[in-house]
Design a protein with these regions (language model features):
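C-terminal catalytic/motor cores of large multi-domain enzyme assemblies
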Residues: 6, 10-17, 29, 34, ...
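Short acidic, glycine/serine/threonine-rich helix-capping segments at coil-helix boundaries
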Residues: 1, 18-30
Length: 293
């Protein structure tokens, strides 16, 4: 289908199938604004009409020849399905798990709550991850035709679950924010995602992603990388663990971090070092009070 170069670039960045984007009736081709309008429709929960012929439905096995309800892979759900399948097919993805001691974060957050609002536990993790990206530039990267492009600024995407799918708004210049500023922006983006008021700039330019399933009692999981990023961090639930420290038995508040990375971009040792930097920052959250230098 005819499409402008800007439209193709934006569609590729957001993982949008141009065959699903209506042609601009005046331009008689797909424009960047056509893609932007299509994305807004997906965010609002509307499934735009498909311009490609639908394939014939597959016959159900005999054992399932009874009334069923089919959820069509169209609109946002269809975009997610294609994007995640392409991600797993095109990257060498693997995941490591590391526990983080959260006692210092719990104490810091409690002190903040006494004087007003406090960041969420996920906000602390995002802030720590953004600073760790500055220490480990290989993780803040993209695979290009020429090699691994190291990106100068960390823009961290935060996965937000909606009724019909998952959307990843982006906190711009994440490491350049102090914890309070980051918390305000993450709250704004999460609310905008849920009420369908996100704008296109809120979804562009992410260099790394954080996904949280801790609210469902999950410890570790294997998040799928959001292209064109080369890594994504999963955040598990807060839990009380019995641990042995210097010969003394005690209870510590901990959570599990799950880092999935593209082995084409970097190996296991750099991945582990990056995750360890996050753990160290969570162990002393005072470093998150000011923007990273």
């Amino acid at each position: 289908m005819p499409a402008t170069a800007a439209a193709r670039a934006l569609a590729d960045l957001l993982g949008i199938d141009l065959a699903q984007v209506p042609v601009d009736p005046i331009e008689q081709r797909i424009t960047k604004e056509s893609v932007a309008h299509h994305v807004r429709s997906l965010i609002a929960g509307a499934a735009p009409p498909s311009t490609s012929p639908e394939s014939a439905p597959s016959a159900l096995p005999a054992a399932l020849q009874e009334p069923t309800r089919t959820i069509r892979l169209s609109g946002m759900r269809g975009t997610i399905a294609k994007r995640m399948h392409d991600s797993l097919r095109q990257m060498a993805q693997l995941t490591l798990f590391m526990d983080a001691d959260m006692d210092a974060v719990v104490a810091d957050r409690s002190a903040r709550k006494e004087s007003g609002t406090a960041p969420s536990f996920t906000d602390y993790v995002i802030a720590a991850a953004a600073r760790a990206l500055g220490q480990h530039p290989l993780v803040n990267s993209q695979i290009t035709d020429d090699g691994v492009a190291l990106l100068p600024t960390a823009h961290v995407g935060m996965a937000v679950a909606l009724d019909d799918g998952l959307i990843v708004p982006v906190i711009r210049d994440t490491a350049g924010r102090d914890l309070s500023s980051l918390s305000v922006e993450s709250s704004r983006l999460a609310q905008a995602a849920r009420d369908g008021s996100l704008e296109l700039p809120d979804l562009e330019g992410g260099t790394f992603s954080v996904s949280t399933l801790g609210m469902y009692g999950v410890d570790g999981f294997t998040p799928v990388i959001n292209p064109p990023n080369t890594a994504i961090l999963g955040v598990g639930r807060l839990r009380d663990d019995v641990v042995l420290t210097d010969g003394e038995v005690g209870v510590r508040t901990r959570l599990t971090l799950s880092l999935t990375w593209d082995h084409r971009a970097f190996d296991g040792a750099p991945a582990a070092a990056f995750c360890k930097s996050i753990v160290d920052l969570l162990g002393d959250p005072s470093a998150l009070d000011a923007p990273a230098s």
